[in-house]
Amino acid sequence: MKRLLFIYNPHAGKELLKPKLADVIDIFVKAGYEVVAYPTQAYRDAYKKIKKYDSSEYDLIVCSGGDGTLDEVVTGMMKRDRDKREPIGYIPTGTTNDFASSLHIPRGLLEAADNAVNGEVFACDAGRFNDDIFVYIAAFGLFTDVSYQTKQSMKNVLGHLAYVLEGAKRLFNIPSYKVKV
């Protein structure tokens, strides 16, 4: 029997996965997988889990969460030897899910779960900036840490607006520079 490691962030977005978790796992099982479910417990937890598992244990890795959870899984996978990288499926349950939208991954949890186990595998570009891996965006500037500094509790209540409010707090701290033209 094929084996699937399901890494998920139970607090992503507005905790959308929790009420449908059994249905998602059922889709995996019906697709012929023995499933090991791993709920993340802290920042970088998904990264650590992916880096240390034995590649002979799983045929497919599926992650569920926001762009941050996906980033941790991809980063962990890219740090593994090339011959020890399994395909990654993604079920977007974050606040904005920009990466999933750009790849036309279904927004519905059950549709995305089915897509993860029955969809077509395709290559996805990954970049490296110093020692950081990225698949969606690499940025610099004044507001780049907004998505990381926005509290999960605020995202759960306000959704995307939480990012806007966190960014607005930074407006008062933008340094000014004297320039001569």
Regions found by a protein language model. Give the residues of each.
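Short beta->alpha linker loops
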Residues: 41-44, 65-68, 94, 141
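Short Gly/Thr/Asp-enriched flexible loops that form oxyanion-binding sites at enzyme active sites
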Residues: 69-82
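Catalytic core of DAGKc-family lipid kinases
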Residues: 31, 80-181
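Generic hydrophobic alpha-helical membrane-span motif
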Residues: 15, 73, 98-100
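Short, glycine/acidic-enriched loop or turn micro-motifs at the edges of active sites
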Residues: 12, 70, 95
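A residue-level signal for conserved active-site and pocket-lining positions in enzyme catalytic cores
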Residues: 9, 67, 146
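ATP/NTP phosphate-donor binding region
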Residues: 1-64, 75
